[in-house]
Amino acid sequence: MRAIVVALLLAVPLSAQTRKPPARKPAPPVVALKKVVPEVTCPTPLGVGLKTKVTYCEVMAGRDPAGGVLIPIPSHKGPATLSFDLHNLHLYSEEQVRAKRAFSRYTATIGVLTMDNTLISRAIVQSEFRTAVDLVDRVGGGAGPGGAKAVAPTGTEPITISIPEGEEQVSLLGEKLMVERIDGTAAYTQAGRPIAVISNVALEYKPGPPPRKPKR
């Protein structure tokens, strides 16, 4: 039996006895997520918060994405994540607060659209105002105390939207604002009317491959 085993070993080529398994290909490098603050095109800026120093942008009602709040999306692999804070807009009156007639309940709806007017998602913020403590901040650039404007953001809803791969820019447009007050309820949808306010816009994405150089 031993002689047979030796004979079989001799019959196998030496290269087969010493052949190594093929080397495994190294795994592709993991591309880290990148987070940036995009250069937002805001047609109707509200202003900068006096306390927070945050920039606020009004989102107007409309139907044409080119006229909305434009947010460029860098080249990305897979979906990109767009995040921002969504606020309602309140016209502050100290007299109404003192008279206990300032109560307002706001429900604002905006759309996030591609530039060919395809709806990606909607975002909603609902909040109530009773006194000045319900304001997120006062905004500079007005004639009020400390240079504050009469209008101010109230309520905050953190929004996160997934932007499909291939989209290079999105637009935010207002859809509808519902306002409930002591004297009744009203709905606003007409184009050009402020619907909501955004702040703290950010993007998180996995960078896409660099563009190929044209062959000469």
Task: Show which residues each predicted segment covers.
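Sec-dependent signal peptide recognition
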Residues: M1-A7
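Compositionally biased, proline/threonine/alanine/serine-rich low-complexity intrinsically disordered stretches
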Residues: L8-L10, L14-E39, P211-R216
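C-terminal edge strands of extracellular/lumenal beta-sandwich accessory domains
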Residues: K35-V36, P74, A150, I159-R216
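Non-catalytic, beta-strand-enriched accessory regions in extracellular/secretory proteins
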Residues: V54-P74, P79-T81
